[in-house]
Amino acid sequence: EKAGYEVLVFHATGAGGRAMESLIEDGLVAGVLDLTTTEWADEHVGGILAAGPTRLESAARNGVPAVIAPGCLDMVNFGPRDTIPEKFADRLFYEHNPQITLMRTTAEECAELGCILSEKANLSTGPVDVLFPTEAISVISASGQPFHDPTADQALLEAIKTNLRKDIRLHEIPTTINDVEFSRIAAETLLDFLQVETTESV
């Protein structure tokens, strides 16, 4: 906002991701901070807050500058505990509230999600960077928290490293995703992209 942009916030609820993708597709968005990509965990694993298989594609295909992070890819969203499919019975869960139960993604699922995130970023026709917060990708994946799983997080990171297009920068940031420093770096990266876009269009 200090740089003169109107900032819109979209919650990663499935509907939120679809709404954001639609606005980007309509040409109403100058740049995207796509930091909470958790809807892909629901899409891939089978949660209730998926945004569809084209999530992460609108900015890429339309050349809109973007900064992408794997925010909350450690979790899949379900409703009350008794509504969770039986096939997930042995998994690690965290009850966020009586209506929402979160399930930890496994290392294998994280590797698959890293491939998907990379594939979507690789579609980009405009400037894009990927930021990876190495200390935690969510509040509850930090050290001492219930979803702390360095092996799964490393599988996610390695899959992104392996599959990301070589001309797309991957920044490993030694913070949690909610640290002020991470937010600053993400915002400055996007503003740098937008500055270049503005300069080139003059």
What is each PLM-predicted segment?
Residues 1-69, 77-80, 90-91, 102-202:
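Metallocofactor- and cofactor-centric catalytic cores in central/energy metabolism, strongly enriched
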Residues 74, 95-101:
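Conserved anion-binding
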